[in-house]
Amino acid sequence: MNARFIHPAHPHIVAHNCFEVIGDTIRLELTQGEYALFDLVDLPLVAPHRWCAAWFRRNIYAITQMRDERGRQRSVRMHRLIIGVADPEVLVDHRNLDGLDNHRDNLRVATRAENGWNCPRPLRNKSGFKGVTRDPKSSRYSAEIKVNGVTLRLGRYTCPVEAARAYDEAARRHHGAFARTNF
């Protein structure tokens, strides 16, 4: 795994992780049997570091160790290195929710709220849809969405699919490009 590899297109770059070139994509081998994907143009930025897979909350990311300006060792996630974000207050969002897909077109800078909008359905949600809950007393489904810290109730429906469609419409309207919809 930690053998050094030299890419013919970039003979001056020595890589610490095994990687495969697939068109314009690099597939980099990590620990735990995982792989990170990124654009070929980012190979000079990524290859000089030793990368491993690390879980954080519900996602897995490629991380490495680097020294900061004071010489202290710190963990750096691949997506933050590629986008060039060092400030811990600035978030980088993966559009497709895959923390190991670090293609530039999958990454975007986001506020905490925008990053939250692009979250999947909560694990404990029993309706099967984001923004939809079932009222056990009436057997109806409620759709709601949070906007600027305020919960907006979108209505009550007999069918969970109708409620999910109402949530999706509101998510697109209020969350724009960061909306994570059901359909």
PLM-predicted stretches and their roles:
Residues 1-92, 97-183:
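Conserved recognition-core residues within compact binding domains
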